[in-house]
Amino acid sequence: MPFGNTHNKFKLNYKPEEEYPDLTKHNNHMAKALTPEIYKKLRDKETPSGFTLDDVIQTGVDNPGHPFIMTVGCVAGDEESYQVFKDLFDPIIQDRHGGYKPTDKHKTDLNHENLKGGDDLDPNYVLSSRVRTGRSIKGYTLPPHCSRGERRAVEKLSIEALNSLTGEFKGKYYPLKSMTEQEQQQLIDDHFLFDKPVSPLLLASGMARDWPDARGIWHNDNKTFLVWVNEEDHLRVISMQKGGNMKEVFRRFCVGLQKIEEIFKKAGHPFMWNEHLGYVLTCPSNLGTGLRGGVHVKLAHLSKHPKFEEILTRLRLQKRGTGGVDTAAVGSVFDISNADRLGSSEVEQVQLVVDGVKLMVEMEKKLEKGQSIDDMIPAQK
């Protein structure tokens, strides 16, 4: 949290219009939703742990946005933020999640057997498969707001829980502060570890305070099941492997995640969840499943096709560069994943990835032979 609450009380000496941020050059969801009226109504409110409206919006004020990417521009500081500041969060959620209304209910389905196919994506094109989500532990504030003691308590709880996993999930925790620069960089390059906190979104929201205190990575012995501790969320759970067997990646994801949830519940610390928002996370873009199922796929021809963007939109998929968000594609390899998080289930979201990527690989093969793909362009899903 950038400011203490005494500072927030002090700001109330000024009129709302004197404190209202200049958002004229901004392109993010928060800037679109925050009117002077909403600012006036919410600015003296705070959550039980003391998170304020100015804390919610600071990252979006400091980062006007990207000309092509619509960022969210706000964060939650605790579970109650979404309720206390709902006049701002509701329109942002509706805008970001395809019209998801304040009365809508989210659905969860972590039964991996409900996924159809997914074990036959062509490994000549699909280089790796990955599914991730975030989880927040009830009773603690979120990374933009938590204190050092709280963050360390989350780490301690997480280590105890993860160290009790057995079988294919047996593994070890590696705290960031005891890693050498080289070890850290190697893990980042292998896509196992989160980047150092250089992202302005992380910095402006206060998530990088005290770095690297109480941050770390836990992974199983095969490095196919990983948990990041105390980055943007309390926990980021990741299942990944080389090749195109998304079915196996999703099975491991569901089984491991449910084991972890069970252990936390038994310890009296369930994950934050409600039937409207699903799993409650720091960034509103991750509400719902928090799930991003993605593959690294080689699309040398399709990526140059004039309808590439339209095909992705119709399949409800999004593309990122090879190194993740805000990076370029190297050697025509794209990171393709589900665009939706809220209002549909985990199984449905991964199904869209499996079916969509399969179709795109078929299109790529046709284009290689110089054939047209016009008859393969899908309808809007």
Swiss-Prot record:
The keyword Nucleotide-binding applies. Its EC number is 2.7.3.2. GO terms for biological process: phosphocreatine biosynthetic process; response to heat. The modification Phosphothreonine is found at T166, T180, T313, T322. Residues 125-367 form the Phosphagen kinase C-terminal domain. The modification Phosphoserine is found at S164, S178, S199, S372. It is found in: Cytoplasm. GO terms for cellular component: cytoplasm; extracellular space. ATP binds at residues 128-132, 191, 236, 292, 320-325, 335. GO terms for molecular function: ATP binding; creatine kinase activity. It is an enzyme of class 2 (transferase). Keywords: ATP-binding, Cytoplasm, Kinase, Nucleotide-binding, Phosphoprotein, Transferase. It catalyses: creatine + ATP = N-phosphocreatine + ADP + H(+). It comes from the Eukaryota. Reversibly catalyzes the transfer of phosphate between ATP and various phosphogens (e.g. creatine phosphate). Creatine kinase isoenzymes play a central role in energy transduction in tissues with large, fluctuating energy demands, such as skeletal muscle, heart, brain and spermatozoa. Belongs to the ATP:guanido phosphotransferase family. Dimer of identical or non-identical chains, which can be either B (brain type) or M (muscle type). With MM being the major form in skeletal muscle and myocardium, MB existing in myocardium, and BB existing in many tissues, especially brain. This is Creatine kinase M-type. It comes from Canis lupus familiaris (Dog). The gene is CKM.
